[in-house]
């Protein structure tokens, strides 16, 4: 009898929201009491969904926050009640509907909620499939147990992925640190000459390290979060499995579907065999090339371009830059107008000369050809302005016709134009050039007395691309630039650059 009374008292001091004994109870003007944390959370939901209106979760009577009062009397009852020990059978928890006050005995399959018999007859659950909690609890217990095993397996996989990414991160750090040490050691021998190269290489490695470690750190964080998420889900399921039937069934279908549809996110990794590996250059060869380039650069002249009436190239206002355009020749016939591209060779249409003639001495200049897929440059004995449609076709690019040039076509094919053979005198002998590093800037050196024209790959430490010897300079020669069909401009570099 006394135990029954205690159960009734316990029911009276149970929070209608969390269904636990009241903690720091607060009473509303309507007389209902709630845990401080529960009614505060209810405040937030009311503010979010009901535009500031607050109402009692039990009777729906509106109230103002300032009217909420701590209920010390109820708090004292709860403290005394916690000291009383009930027998297991008498202590069985009886849960009631917060809306209707009736016992929660049914489970709504559509909403995954434990409800009372009045809820079942309400509009909210009308037509839904409802079962006694005892009928479905075992079924969902098995489903949750299966989901728990699946989740534990995925947790093991997640932990392995986390460990793998940590190991790879450490490996990358060691590898890149090792590479940086090697780079510094290799460049120490020629510090004065290769300072800029070492700095560039280290910057690349730093950037590589930054990018890779940043990506791996991000992946590591994601793996940690993923593992933590698994732990939280497992903890939630374990709590459900150890709790009451109502706790087990509340939202159970959604949790099971979320676990079944869950896929582990794999971290982004990098393949070490695909990365750029540093190779120490031929330091002696680089030193020789550097000395040669340093020597010819003493003869750097400030070259500008000379506009003419033959070329269809576009020359910039500063006379240092030239780009191509598609020329049009318009033919007028009685009553008609036809416009179509020029029939002249496109190479000819875009070739221009430097304004400075070379008749003696040594002369050097550099041309920026970065991002171009086609170009021709070198020296020329000057245009032969006869007719626009029969001059400087491709066969004209021969030393015997006054052209000492090299060129690029299709972005990767570097060639030098030599004199044609006796069998094909009107066609140049085009010799492929082996260029390991594509030049963004090409240096041209003319030694008039020695009758040589040399081309240097400035991008590759001044590597000699090609050298014409025994050139027959019978008259003044000029710098020659031809942007060809590529619309990206060619630019003459100033000596100060």
Swiss-Prot record:
Keywords: Acetylation, Antiviral defense, Autophagy, Coiled coil, Cytoplasm, Immunity, Innate immunity, Metal-binding, Nucleus, Phosphoprotein, Transferase, Ubl conjugation, Ubl conjugation pathway, Zinc, Zinc-finger. Disulfide bonds: none annotated. It is an enzyme of class 2 (transferase). Residues 283-497 form the B30.2/SPRY domain. GO terms for cellular component: nucleus; P-body. Residues 137-225 form a coiled coil. The modification N-acetylalanine is found at residue 2. The B box-type zinc finger domain and the coiled-coil domain contribute to the higher and low order multimerization respectively which is essential for restriction activity. The coiled coil domain is important for higher order multimerization by promoting the initial dimerization. The B30.2/SPRY domain acts as a capsid recognition domain. Polymorphisms in this domain explain the observed species-specific differences among orthologs. Capsid-specific restriction factor that prevents infection from non-host-adapted retroviruses. Blocks viral replication early in the life cycle, after viral entry but before reverse transcription. In addition to acting as a capsid-specific restriction factor, also acts as a pattern recognition receptor that activates innate immune signaling in response to the retroviral capsid lattice. This is Tripartite motif-containing protein 5. It comes from Papio anubis (Olive baboon).
